[in-house]
Amino acid sequence: MPLELTQSRVQKIWIPVDHRPSLPRTCGPKLTNSPTVIVMVGLPARGKTYISKKLTRYLNWIGVPTKVFNLGEYRRDGVKQYSSYNFFRPDNEEAMKVRKQCALAALRDVKSYLTKEGGQIAVFDATNTTRERRHMILHFPKENDFKVFFIESVCDDPTVVASNIMEVKISSPDYKDCNSRENAMDDFMKRINCYEASYQPLDPDNDDRDLSLIKVIDVGQRFLVNRVQDHIQRRIVYYLMNIHWQPRTIYLCRHGESKHNLQGKIGGDSGLSSRGRKFANALSKFVEEQNLKDLKVWTSQLKSTIQTAEALQLPYEQWKALNEIDAGVCEEMTYEEIKDTYPEEYALAEADKYYYRYPTGESYQDLVQRLEPVIMELERQENVLVICHQAVCVCLLAYFLDKSAEEMPYLKCPLHAVLKLTPIAYGCRVESIYLNVESVSTHRERSEDAKKGPNPLMRSNSH
């Protein structure tokens, strides 16, 4: 029997299929030369879990398989009923044993994730406030040849701490049976006091001079960075230096309906249809009603987004990075035309929409890399309206909603709707606002071929 063939992502050559176990297809290229354990450090209510989840979302979005291991969840699995802050007293020897066992269980799962499940980065989300605990954790990656990077969140502003407790902590499962918010707040403050007595901050000038770390001070007002080891740690540092905790709103919308939308064509640079111009006027009215202070407006460099923004009568910035995905030889063709002219390309695109790259064009994976500077700048901003294109919109939305590479191309971003994104404690709230202007639908559902996975005779021509 002939060998099954597949095509190398790097070179367009047919090679025998390798049936040995491999990393999940969502991983793409490995961006780390050895697995990394990120160890969070800091008192409770300092934003460690916020940083852990946000950083994990970013790393997964850029193609680095990452998972959070939250010690609080392990503790709640091991101790079904939370009684009070007394569990966290340093002189509660029985509880200390339980907490250590929970930490060891979490580290065992970290090892499994990084060695057997295709993970590249594990985030160990716990207080880790003593040197003794951190030395125990350091022994684990040394045994397994993992790199370690510490992230310490330091905040002495009582207003920020109280806000974090009220927004996140008192609604945690620990306090589901608590009879009042005040009692929960009081218990949590006493829990913090238990940790404060033995807290030993990271000290890169003395005891911790050899550790790779970043200290995030006062929710990003200052940073201290020490001994960054590699490319991925530099990206982590850069990301953490760009995010902020201030309330803001991000609006995503596509341009008004274009002439190519009406014709069912992809790509190109056509202007707005009459309904597209009507949407642009409706968007202008919507933005005015929002009464947003210092709203920034971003567009691509293509006609449809610029014509949509012109109706707002507001300053706007053009980003080449926001241009629609490049369909290469398939630009300005309908899907039916692509199917007739390039049947193999059509089948490959349907089977593997994220990794598939149009000949001389781009894949969604390429688009994510192109959009990374946009994400960094969005994280720095306050209120922003991004007027973009379908593939660009779904890539940005996937970042904020923590969607996988497989889900990304099939997210719905309809014409003539505004997606209002409001960052919240551990995620993002999304509201879809339709502006009552009719348009064609350009959404394509996942094909049956895509649901089955790639064809054995598969050319996945991305890097």
Curated annotation (Swiss-Prot):
Magnesium as UniProt keyword: no
Region (6-phosphofructo-2-kinase): 1-246
Tissue expression notes: Brain.
Binding site for ATP: 42-50, 164-169, 346-349, 390-394, 426
A single GO BP: fructose metabolic process
Record-listed Phosphoserine modification sites: 462
Start and end residues of each stretch annotated as Fructose-2,6-bisphosphatase: 247-463
Gene Ontology CC terms: cytosol
Residues where beta-D-fructose 2,6-bisphosphate binds: 254, 261, 267, 335, 353, 364, 390
SMART domains (alphabetical): PGAM
PTM text: Phosphorylation by AMPK stimulates activity.
Region Disordered, annotated ranges: 444-463
UniProt keyword annotations, A-Z: ATP-binding, Hydrolase, Kinase, Multifunctional enzyme, Nucleotide-binding, Phosphoprotein, Transferase
Key word tRNA-binding present: no
Record site feature (Transition state stabilizer), residues: 254, 261, 389
Active-site positions on this chain: 125, 155, 255 (tele-phosphohistidine intermediate), 324 (proton donor/acceptor)
Molecular function terms from GO: 6-phosphofructo-2-kinase activity; ATP binding; fructose-2,6-bisphosphate 2-phosphatase activity
List of residues binding beta-D-fructose 6-phosphate: 75, 99, 127, 133, 169, 191, 195
Catalyzed reaction equations: beta-D-fructose 2,6-bisphosphate + H2O = beta-D-fructose 6-phosphate + phosphate; beta-D-fructose 6-phosphate + ATP = beta-D-fructose 2,6-bisphosphate + ADP + H(+)
Gene3D superfamilies reported for this sequence: P-loop containing nucleotide triphosphate hydrolases, Phosphoglycerate mutase-like
Enzyme Commission designation: 2.7.1.105, 3.1.3.46
Task performed by this protein: Catalyzes both the synthesis and degradation of fructose 2,6-bisphosphate.
Family: In the C-terminal section; belongs to the phosphoglycerate mutase family.
Oligomeric and partner information: Homodimer. Forms a heterodimer with PFKFB2.
Protein name (Swiss-Prot/TrEMBL): 6-phosphofructo-2-kinase/fructose-2,6-bisphosphatase 3
